[in-house]
């Protein structure tokens, strides 16, 4: 199964646990494939660094290494312009170009779309309840 993980799900999984962490663990263990572009990976790294700085450095940026290593990095070719927050179009483009079936997000600007072509947009809880054994 191929998915795209929105940055807020990644942050929740890394720093807070719960359903987002179950998804990240499933990617790291190879149970599913998470796809990203270089732009998305850069955003992951920048936001994690911001969180580390806020927590005064008690967590190493290396916490992302297992996930980044497990990601399938793709080169986007499709331009998508349907999200009310233009910065989120990169997740739709990545999902389309990687032939992912799901975007896992907590972002209302993405969740309101619900489905883009054959790609479902689900919360981490919805995704876990439907596709991961809890």
Residues covered by each model-derived region:
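Metal-dependent nucleic-acid phosphoesterase active-site entry motif
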Residues: 1-18
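PIN/NYN-family metal-dependent endoribonuclease catalytic core
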Residues: 5, 21-49
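A secondary-structure boundary/capping signal
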Residues: 6-7, 36-37, 106-107, 123
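Short, flexible loop segments at the rims of nucleotide/cofactor-binding pockets, characterized by
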Residues: 11-13, 53, 78-84
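Residues at secondary-structure transition points
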Residues: 18, 35, 58, 82-89
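Short active-site oxyanion
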Residues: 31-34, 99-101, 119
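Active-site neighborhoods of divalent-metal-dependent phosphate/nucleic-acid chemistry enzymes
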Residues: 69-102, 108
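Acidic, PIN/NYN-like endoribonuclease modules and their adjacent C-terminal/linker elements
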Residues: 98, 108-134
């Amino acid at each position: 199964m191929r998915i795209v993980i929105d940055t807020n799900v990644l942050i929740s999984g890394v720093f807070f646990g719960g359903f987002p962490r179950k998804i990240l663990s499933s990617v790291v263990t190879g149970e599913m494939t998470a796809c990203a572009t270089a732009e998305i990976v850069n955003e992951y790294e920048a936001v994690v660094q911001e969180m580390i700085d806020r927590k005064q450095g008690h967590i190493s940026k290396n916490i992302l290494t297992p996930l980044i290593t497990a990601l399938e990095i793709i080169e986007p070719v499709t331009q998508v312009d349907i999200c009310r927050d233009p910065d989120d179009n990169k997740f739709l483009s990545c999902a389309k170009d990687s032939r992912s079936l799901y975007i896992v997000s907590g972002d209302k600007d993405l969740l309101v779309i619900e489905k883009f072509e054959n790609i479902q947009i689900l919360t981490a809880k919805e995704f876990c309840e439907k596709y991961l054994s809890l």
